[in-house]
UniProtKB/Swiss-Prot annotation:
Source organism: Roseiflexus castenholzii (strain DSM 13941 / HLO8)
Family stated for the protein in its record: Belongs to the TACO1 family.
Protein's name in the database: Probable transcriptional regulatory protein Rcas_0718
Primary subcellular site in the record, as a coarse category: cytoplasm
InterPro entries: Integrase-like_N (IPR017856), TACO1_YebC-like_2nd/3rd_dom (IPR048300), TACO1_YebC_N (IPR049083), Transcrip_reg_TACO1-like (IPR002876), Transcrip_reg_TACO1-like_dom3 (IPR026564), YebC-like (IPR029072)
Length: 255
């Protein structure tokens, strides 16, 4: 499985998410600010992208004061300048020919570009030109269902998701990932909630059209590079076309 939950599980097993909660809150706040500005509203009920960002922040136990400050920044309140915050993408390759699409939120393009470039070159990667790998990915909606919250038959959950309009459903342990056409994300999410499923997250994601499986040594190097990129303050997410098998995940965590 090459899905979001596999990588998220690896990061949690290594203790990264808990150790760097302050950095996580900063990244979540940027998501909220950009969602507020782009959606033109500070009301999550009227701004679906903002609702998703706020839900994600709440799931991470981000304080409501922090959430409201991020919304205020997006609305230009309090003297803050949300216009300086840009959502941009960088592209390149990791060892083994693994394609990387790096999503960043920054108020200083030069700083972020320099940090991304340096991290890639120091860890066996190669920065690419705009468009060099983005064509390998497609925009999708991703809805996460946690069966540890409410015990349900995974096969039944899969059927409900497909009936609701899911394009693909992947199951990893207690986590069910439901992939949708991005334009249908809100509608599918609402149907799953109405069906009583424990929806714990919904977001935009980028899915590789095809995945690659380099040799183990290069795959581990690619995963280390992805981890280092995600640790950069300005980087929000890193998408790749690396197929992460259970065996590879175990080696990465133990290494």
């Amino acid at each position: 499985m090459s899905g979001h939950s596999k990588w998220h599980s690896i990061r949690r097993t290594k203790g990264v998410l808990d150790q760097r909660r302050g950095q996580l809150f900063t990244k979540l706040a940027r998501d909220i600010t950009i969602a507020t500005r782009e959606g033109g509203s500070g009301d999550p009920e009227a701004n679906f992208r903002l609702r998703l960002a706020v839900d994600k922040a709440r799931a991470a136990n981000m304080p409501m004061d922090n959430i409201q400050r991020a919304i205020d920044r997006g609305l230009g309140r309090g003297g803050s300048d949300a216009a300086a915050l840009e959502e941009i993408y960088y592209e390149g390759y990791a060892p083994g020919g693994v394609a990387l699409l790096i999503e960043a939120a920054t108020d200083n393009r030069n700083r972020t570009a320099s940090d991304v470039r340096a991290t890639m070159t120091k860890n066996g990667g190669s920065p690419g030109e705009p468009g060099s790998v983005s064509w390998m990915f497609e925009t999708r909606g991703l809805i996460t269902i946690d069966l540890s919250v409410k015990r349900l038959d995974p096969d039944e959950v899969m059927l409900i998701a497909i009936d609701a309009g899911a394009e693909d459903v992947q199951i990893e342990d207690d986590i069910v990932e439901v992939y949708t056409d991005f334009k249908q994300l809100a509608a599918v999410r609402q149907q799953l909630i109405a069906a009583g499923l424990p929806v714990t997250g919904a977001e935009k994601t980028m899915i590789a059209k095809t995945t690659v499986q380099p040799d183990t040594a290069d795959a581990l190097k690619a995963m280390r590079l992805i981890e280092k990129l995600e640790d950069l303050d300005d980087v929000q997410k890193v998408y790749s076309n690396l197929e992460i098998t259970s065996e590879l995940a175990e080696q990465f965590v133990s290494g």
